[in-house]
Amino acid sequence: MSADTQSETLEFQAEVQQLLSLMIHSVYSNREVFLRELISNASDAIDKLRFEALQQESLYEDDPELKIRVEADPEARTVTVIDNGIGMSREDVIENLGTIAHSGTRRFLEQLTGDQHKDAQLIGQFGVGFYSAFVVADRVEVYTRKAGAAAAEGVRWSSDGQGAYTVDTVERAERGTAVVLHLPEAQQEFCDDMRLRQIIRKYSDHISVPIEMPVRNADQGDDADSEAEAPQWEIVNRASALWMRPKSEISEEDYQELYKHVAHDFDDPLTWIHNHVEGRQSYVSLLYIPKRPPFDLYEQKPAHGVKLYVRRVFITEDTEHLLPRYLRFVRGVIDSDDLPLNISREMLQHNPMISSLRSASVKRILDRLECMAKNEPEDYATFWQAFGRVFKEGIAEDPGNRERIARLLRFSSTHEEKETPDVSLDDYVARMKDGQEKIYYVTAESFNAARNSPHLEIFRRHGIEVLLLPDPVDEWLVAHLHEYDGKQLASVAKGELDLEALGEEDDKQARQEKEQAYEDLCKRLGETLGERVSEVRVSHRLTDSPACLVVGEYDFGMGMQRLLQAAGHQLPAGQPALEVNPDHSVIERLATESGQRFEDWALTLYEQSLLAEGGQLEDPAAYVRRVNNLLAG
């Protein structure tokens, strides 16, 4: 080789300086990912060697144990990542490291055909991973030799990232590549042995290739003899992707240990779903359902979720792309063989494959929950206690699975009136009365408020079950779940009741007579209450309470109205109706009053009804004075 080709300085192509600046300051805001990217490239190189050696075993030379090594030198402020993979020739170095938008791995993939795609587990589609080194380094050196080449054909590449790089031919006995990062003082933290181990375990723990670091002995001296000794190496990653193994080879303890690692939880999981998928998409998913809710379950962006790997390399924990929000409690791993990534690997590309993977994961989770609800009711009760409130959000978020989600819902009801929600919609439908066509429910701000709602009185008299919905999310649930199994869901606190369906058809004439008898009282009450109510009418739903408030059949429930108002939404004008019980002594007494006492009685009756619905009084002090005056006679 002539002297002219021994050393040369070349300009980066494709406006590399502009792209480097963009990547360093925008894309790679999380600086520690440089190590993930370099280890990923090293893993690619080893995988490429493994594939090539299938046809040419001599490429292993005398070093068949494939590995990645990471070493820091705090005094020199360097971090070195070494692999004994395929390596690069001088031409490879210029082509692959001189252009930001090109990757030897990508070209390698393009040259493969047929089944070879399956065996070549490679990443590096866009070729910017290597340049993440400049996020922390002010100078980078690469020493490499291609497998099968002579030791004299080693190559040294060097650059400060400022627009040019130098390529030299050097003697190199070792096959593979060593990337040496020279760090400025501001990045000194990455020379710390423990810091590097922490990054490796965070991002590269499950790469199937062993990642080694020098053993740090407490009694290791600093004398020349100690420095001359060859370092002892130890594996710092697990070097085994547990989820890739057949289920028959994985113990329950193995599954639980992995869960605690990926979920940062001390408890064992409630259950898990492990699937190997091959076909148009090849991937493995191992999804866990925890026993208890994490502390950040209701935060906009939880700290943990489902980890996405591509060929055992951790990419992201951005669960939003992988599962809908109502399943944000799920933890685990999805490892894809062929999922494409965007240029920074920080976010997933908008790609139909992601949508397909997400849909399949949702289906498997719902399958598991259905199986648990049927065969393991105690475990399902644990799940519902922990995540039922979040899971209910799926009725609004996931219309495609609404029926399946509805089947998994659990409620309290008047059937037993216990606070533990264990009544399914199927249970309710199975207990419906002959001729009953609707599933009745009542919403409230607490279980006791729901159980004691005056709206339930007529239903109790006829033995008709009513679902008790005390969660704030229940208002959203019933706003999107209009029917189940062909039965309409109906609020007992909305509109006028179909009394014939409740077995009240024989009392129709008596009801009409009472409406006429109290027509004048209803009119007087309406005039006194004014715009507080839309109308006052005789109630046919009350048996024990003197009055209640009823919204229109198509209006928001009073609880929903309060939620929307608290969120700053403008609501359409409309007021509830006040229904009075003509058989109650308070109403009979009210009919005999007049003047100020009638007004006090009317306002007290209205405000008591408002309180029973969980509402708030505009002037509590005035209410107390009125009640005291009425008590005083």
From Swiss-Prot:
Keywords: ATP-binding, Chaperone, Cytoplasm, Nucleotide-binding, Stress response. PROSITE patterns: HSP90. Signal peptide: none annotated. Residues 1-345 are annotated as: A. Transmembrane segments: none annotated. One of its GO terms (cellular component) is cytoplasm. Residues 346-562 are annotated as: B. One of its GO terms (molecular function) is ATP-dependent protein folding chaperone. Residues 563-633 are annotated as: C. It holds the Pfam family HSP90. It is found in: Cytoplasm. The keyword Signal does not apply. Belongs to the heat shock protein 90 family. This is Chaperone protein HtpG. It comes from Halorhodospira halophila (strain DSM 244 / SL1).
